[in-house]
Amino acid sequence: MTNTIYIHQPEKAVSFTRLPNFLFEAPTFTPLSNEAKVLYAFILRRTDLSRKNGWADEYGRIYLYYPINEVVERLHCGRQKAVNTLRELQYAGLVEIQKQGCGKPNRIYPKSYEAVPNTDFKKSGYGTPED
């Protein structure tokens, strides 16, 4: 007999990360690499923790720290790939990266899909992150 674990066993449940549908359906975001889409999902997950811990700047914007070495670990990639993936999210308008200098990690400000120009999900009929 095999040791099969079925999904209905709540004590064996695992944590998961939500991956927003709009990243795959909205024309604005379909060109993003899959790594960038997954990293954005990890950033959104970490945003919840930042919100709970009260990490907001003087304007009330939630920020987080995601050092490059952690991105490398999470995505199982090299340093340059991690940098490029973060940059890809920045160019897509999904995050703002603020350098702090003096050896401090960059602050990452996650943005909502609604903040990205040329993205009108109501007109396009594509889903929202809650779908």
List each language-model region with its residue ranges.
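Short amphipathic alpha-helical elements of helix-turn-helix/winged-helix folds
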Residues: 42-46
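Winged helix-turn-helix DNA-binding recognition segment
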Residues: 29, 34, 47-110
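Charged low-complexity intrinsically disordered patches
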Residues: 2-3, 112-131
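Positively charged, structured surface patches that bind polyanionic biopolymers
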Residues: 1-37, 53-62, 73-74
